[in-house]
């Protein structure tokens, strides 16, 4: 189906007040940002019945007035010690905007998305194959609107040195509000954008690092024969797993921790890994309120740290759901100001810029806390939310479900793991596989 997508136009959308100087010209990158330079742009998207492309572009220009870092570019400076430094220039260079048509693809093709990747769906996203360090010449946010036979998909890719998922969804929320209500004059929109600033007092900036464009010394091999499936957990089953985990645990477990632990154990059970091997659950942690002093909840930027729960396969399978959920809970509780700053100080002393993460991990991205279904651009609420490349074995993208308190997960797994999960009666008791 990929060849059936036709690009109608490519353009640059600049902030509406391009000639008006922004309050901040330069944003320094923290160790959290710099460590992601070799990662690909993160890509998300929303499915609609109808959208007007010109109105989308016009409202995007207005939204970029407030969220001006997204319209900037990375700047790379060469240092005398054979290192480089990066910062974000808030120069209003603009956002790449693609208008495409795929008239033979229907809403059902996306809603029932299942099977091998990349498949046709990868072409619905604008930043496939682009790394964060490419932000020196490519826009830090990219948007693609694809008109289908009976619907429209808005795909966007973003550079995770400029924003984390919390910030990018706040931007999408604001953009949709502007588009639907022309609310650019509202008090909320007129407030100054709070940036994260510099909160690593013991670290001088700009940080000198090896050039991320040079060939890395080691690679994490990513399987190419991956499949995607949507996992759906109803409100009733979320509550059942929550109750089961809390009955078995000696500490308070949240619903999302219980569900993630259940999926983690099930995936590892069918992974073929030996009992002695380590498995990890990687989870993004919003650090805004965990830092000391805490940052504004609304502050814009990448203020996300990856928390990692580590156990052996044997430990995970020998213990119950409650124990697995406690490992995730303890990991989250350990994400403190002291730990964050210790990580940053150690990273500067021993700089590592990974290409990817381990292929035997459960890599959780996004969050059920993001209200993706409130993003009505003026033609109705989204039908569905989806994620695009990069594809990674063990990737689990979390979305709030359409049904009250339900959860959706876009899983990327090896085909043999998918096959076993489909046949696993215990797994299917709580999780519906689409």
UniProtKB/Swiss-Prot annotation:
GO biological process: defense response; regulation of defense response to bacterium; regulation of defense response to fungus; response to bacterium; response to jasmonic acid; salicylic acid biosynthetic process
InterPro entries associated with the record: CAT-like_dom_sf, Sec_Metabolite_Acyltrans
Enzyme Commission no: 2.3.1.-
S-S pairs: none
Inducing or repressing factors: By pathogenic bacteria (e.g. P.syringae) and jasmonic acid (MeJA).
Gene Ontology MF terms in the entry: acyltransferase activity
Phenotype seen when the gene is deleted: Hypersusceptiblity to both virulent and avirulent strains of the bacterial pathogen P.syringae associated with impaired pathogen-mediated induction of salicylic acid (SA) and reduced pathogenesis-related (PR) genes induction. These phenotypes are reversed by SA treatment. In the cv. No-0 but not the cv. Columbia background, defects in SA accumulation or signaling enhances resistance to necrotrophic pathogens such as the fungi B.cinerea and A.brassicicola, leading to small necrotic spots and minor chlorosis, as well as reduced fungal growth.
Residues annotated as the enzyme's active site: 376
Keywords in alphabetical order: Acyltransferase, Plant defense, Transferase
Top-level enzyme category: transferase
Family according to the record: Belongs to the plant acyltransferase family.
Entry function: Required for pathogen-induced salicylic acid (SA) accumulation and SA-mediated resistance to virulent and avirulent pathogens (e.g. P.syringae).
Protein name (Swiss-Prot/TrEMBL): Protein ENHANCED PSEUDOMONAS SUSCEPTIBILITY 1
Gene: EPS1
């Amino acid at each position: 189906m990929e060849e059936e997508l036709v690009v109608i136009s490519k353009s640059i959308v600049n902030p509406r007040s391009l000639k008006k100087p922004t309050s901040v010209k330069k944003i320094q990158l923290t160790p959290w940002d710099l460590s992601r330079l070799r990662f690909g742009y993160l890509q998300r998207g929303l499915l609609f019945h109808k959208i007007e492309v010109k109105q989308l572009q016009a409202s995007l220009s207005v939204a970029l007035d407030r969220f001006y870092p997204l319209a900037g570019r990375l700047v790379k400076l060469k240092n005398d010690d054979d290192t480089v430094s990066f910062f974000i220039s808030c120069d209003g260079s603009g956002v790449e905007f693609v208008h495409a048509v795929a008239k033979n693809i229907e809403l059902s093709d996306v809603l029932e998305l299942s099977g091998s990747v990349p498949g046709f769906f990868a072409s619905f996203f604008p930043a496939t194959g682009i790394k964060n360090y490419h932000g020196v010449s490519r826009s830090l946010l990219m948007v693609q609107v694809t008109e289908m036979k009976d619907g429209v998909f808005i795909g966007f890719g973003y550079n995770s040195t400029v924003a984390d998922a919390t910030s990018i969804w706040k931007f999408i929320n604001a953009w949709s509000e502007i588009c639907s209500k022309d609310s650019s004059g509202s008090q909320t929109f007129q407030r100054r954008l709070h940036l994260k600033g510099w909160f690593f007092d013991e670290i001088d900036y700009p940080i000198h690092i090896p050039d991320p464009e040079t060939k890395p010394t080691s690679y994490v091999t990513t399987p190419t024969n991956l499949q995607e499936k949507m996992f759906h957990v109803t409100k009733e089953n979320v509550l059942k797993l929550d109750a089961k985990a809390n009955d078995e645990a000696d500490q308070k477990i949240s619903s999302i921790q219980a569900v993630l632990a259940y999926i983690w154990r099930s995936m590892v059970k069918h992974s073929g890994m030996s009992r002695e091997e380590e498995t990890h659950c990687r989870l993004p942690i919003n650090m805004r309120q965990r830092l000391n002093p805490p940052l504004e909840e609304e502050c814009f930027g990448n203020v996300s740290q990856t928390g990692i729960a580590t156990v052996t396969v044997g430990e995970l399978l020998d213990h119950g759901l409650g124990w697995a959920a406690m490992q995730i809970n303890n990991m989250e509780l350990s994400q403190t100001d002291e730990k964050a700053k210790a990580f940053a100080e150690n990273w500067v002393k021993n700089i590592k810029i990974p290409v990817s993460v381990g292929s035997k991990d459960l890599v959780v991205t996004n969050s059920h806390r993001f209200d993706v279904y409130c993003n009505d651009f003026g033609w109705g609420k989204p039908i569905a939310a989806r994620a695009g490349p990069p594809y990674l074995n063990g990737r689990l993208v979390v979305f709030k479900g359409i049904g009250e308190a339900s959860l959706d997960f876009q899983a990327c797994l090896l085909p043999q793991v998918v096959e076993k999960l489909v046949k696993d009666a215990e797994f299917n008791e709580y999780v519906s596989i689409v």
